[in-house]
Amino acid sequence: MHQMNIEKRIITRRDFIKISAAWLTWSISFFPMRLGGLSRSTPSAGLLDALSGARLSPQAGVDLPPGQQGRVLVNNVSIYDRPSEFGEKVNAYWFDSILPISQVTASPETESHNPIWYRVGSEGYVHSGSVQPVRTILQQPNSEIPAGGILAEVTVPFTDARWSPGKEQQVAYRFYYETTYWVIQLVYDESNTPWYSVLDDKWELVFYVPATHMRLIPAEELAPLSPAVPPGSKKLEVNLREQILVAYEMDEPVYMARVATGARFSTGNYSTPPGWHMTFHKRPSRHMARGNLAANGYDLPGVPWNSYITESGIAIHGTYWHNNFGRPRSHGCINLTPKAAKWVYRWTMPVVPPDQQSAYENYGTLVEIREE
């Protein structure tokens, strides 16, 4: 009888968060989690059963579809003969190297917040935190661009944006996979190669990107998610201790993602502020830079799917400069994978019309940031 009561006990909020974090430890990057039918009132045994099928086996791993690649995010990264820092180093790659990724696996020998490793072809293993999952998907150039422009995303590991159309022209920025930009025109260089004109939303400059490297995003792909759910019945919860985000509809969890929130640095405390907030301001793309063009600091064009929760600029947004979620590391913002950030962007209020670059209202979806 005692055992039956334990198995059927109703989970608390803390239980739910712990179980969620445990599952998400195994599911980074390739396995988004939607939680239809589960709630805080789900018996814990049932919830564990529901999650167990998606866990990775540390021994077997999971094979990935052909064409999966990874971009190195740090100055140099080591390849090991097994998924562990205690393995033998067999190779090393530099920043922006593109690796063939054939499998994802979890290692019991790796730090607990992110034990995910990628198999690099038949060569060895690399830790996922230093590698962005990417693909190379070339696009057909499209001349049907609305007068006000259209949102687009990069569909190759990286592409160089130039000051003028032409592969010999000076590079202005390097744009990365799944970053987003506002395209205003299709043009051709002297060799008749198509380029998109991209309007920079911070400096109000125009850059040029090979049209085969960007996908114009159709309006239906930006349509709101769960539109039948009353806006007041949606809520986001960010748990700073467990570093996860949970979306609720009618108090039932429907989506989860690992995050990386604000951290303490030698230059100051940038912790994400706990309390109640609201997604009152949203932008599908934002060039984030600290200071002016000559200042030292971060300069990140095309940050995708921004849902702002404070007037000071703290936002929930996609991240392409790291893949190491589950530990604080930002300057206050709530970092997600681009796919997870896009889900949040589409699910929350206010709705940004497809032909507009932002929405700023006095209402939005509630966001509770909890310390535990």
Regions found by a protein language model. Name each.
Residues 1-15, 19-30, 37-41:
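N-terminal secretory signal peptides
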Residues 30-83:
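C-terminal segment of N-terminal export signals and the immediately downstream linker at the start
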Residues 42-63, 118-152, 199-231:
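Boundary regions of SH3-family modules and the immediately adjacent low-complexity/disordered segments
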Residues 45, 90-132, 176-212:
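SH3/SH3-like beta-barrel superfamily modules
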Residues 75-84, 158-166:
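Short, structured beta-strand/loop micro-motifs enriched in basic residues and often containing a Trp
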Residues 83-95, 165-177:
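SH3/SH3-like (including bacterial SH3b) beta-barrel domains
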Residues 188-195, 199-274:
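Cell wall/extracellular polymer interaction/catalysis modules
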Residues 229-231, 255, 267-274, 281, ...:
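Exported/periplasmic cell-wall-interacting domains
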